[in-house]
């Protein structure tokens, strides 16, 4: 079978539930892996299925061997990011999906037909696109975080981690905010600075946390960095314990009212472990002038 790594997306207008799947855990491979599903919410029956990578068989437990492990190891190109339903500049509603390969596509939500396709980065265990996309309908942009962490099967090409802004209409690139993965900067930060965690788009600002523990705010129109804060360090806490931050992965930053909530510390795949929950105060005077740590 194939896993479902992320939350489904509900389309009440069409009566459909969308979700993405990962690789097959065992042979033989099926046509339901590395795919996007649309399921009728009344009957539970499949409305359509769109597979992006065929014959992808990989099981993490098989790194130590096993009798039922697939002989052919696939590239492990899950859909970890939930499908995103948004309207383009023409008012057409499309389903936007991103894969660990770095592939980004817009689908017709009624049929699964591919409207446009793009690819950014080289992909890997942590993406490509790993845990989440974001959209800004007012600006007509889709925001795509790319990790390109150098671990995974069959990696080829040059990594290009960072935040990409694409047109919701045709997928064309509007701006790119790169992450400096030079050896010098990696030594300075202590880890790879790619964007694996989910991101969030607010009115004018994109919040993203990276694998090196940096939390950053980007201008939604230009991609310029407005604010950056290093969380991979020790903190005094309100409950009188010393806590330490680390890599930011999986769930990303969360704005709630006038606060920004950040969870820092993730030790998977050799990342920087930790367990710090940070709360920042957003500046009320501007949507791009930010914030102080609490």
Give the ranges of each region predicted by the language model.
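Short, well-ordered beta-to-alpha junction loops that form the rim of enzyme active sites
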Residues: 21-23
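Extracytoplasmic/lumenal domain signature
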Residues: 1, 11-17, 26-79, 84-130, ...
């Amino acid at each position: 079978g194939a896993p479902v790594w992320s939350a489904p997306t509900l389309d009440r207008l069409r009566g459909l539930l969308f979700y993405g799947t990962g690789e097959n855990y065992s042979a033989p491979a099926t046509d339901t892996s590395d795919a996007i599903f649309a399921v009728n919410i009344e009957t539970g029956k499949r409305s359509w299925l769109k597979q992006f990578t065929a014959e992808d068989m990989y099981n993490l437990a098989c790194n130590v061997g096993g009798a039922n492990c697939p002989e052919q190891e696939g590239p492990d190109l899950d859909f970890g990011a939930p499908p995103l339903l948004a309207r383009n500049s023409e008012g057409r509603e499309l389903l936007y999906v991103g894969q660990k390969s770095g592939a980004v596509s817009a689908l017709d939500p009624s049929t699964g037909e591919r409207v446009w396709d793009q690819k950014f980065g080289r992909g890997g265990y942590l993406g490509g696109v790993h845990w989440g996309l974001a959209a800004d309908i007012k600006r007509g942009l889709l925001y795509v975080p790319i990790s390109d962490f150098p671990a995974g099967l069959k990696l080829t090409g040059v990594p290009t981690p960072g935040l990409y802004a694409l047109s919701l209409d045709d997928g064309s690139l509007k701006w790119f905010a790169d992450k400096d993965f030079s050896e010098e900067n990696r030594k300075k930060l202590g880890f790879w600075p790619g964007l694996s965690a989910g991101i969030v788009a607010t009115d004018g600002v994109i919040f993203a946390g990276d694998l090196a523990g940096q939390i950053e705010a980007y201008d939604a129109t230009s991609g310029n960095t407005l604010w950056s804060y290093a969380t991979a360090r020790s903190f005094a806490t309100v409950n009188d314990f010393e806590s330490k931050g680390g890599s930011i992965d999986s769930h990303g930053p969360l704005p709630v009212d006038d606060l920004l909530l950040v969870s820092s510390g993730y030790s998977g795949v050799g990342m920087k472990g930790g367990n710090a929950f940070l709360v920042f105060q957003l500046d009320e005077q501007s949507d791009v002038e930010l914030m102080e740590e609490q």
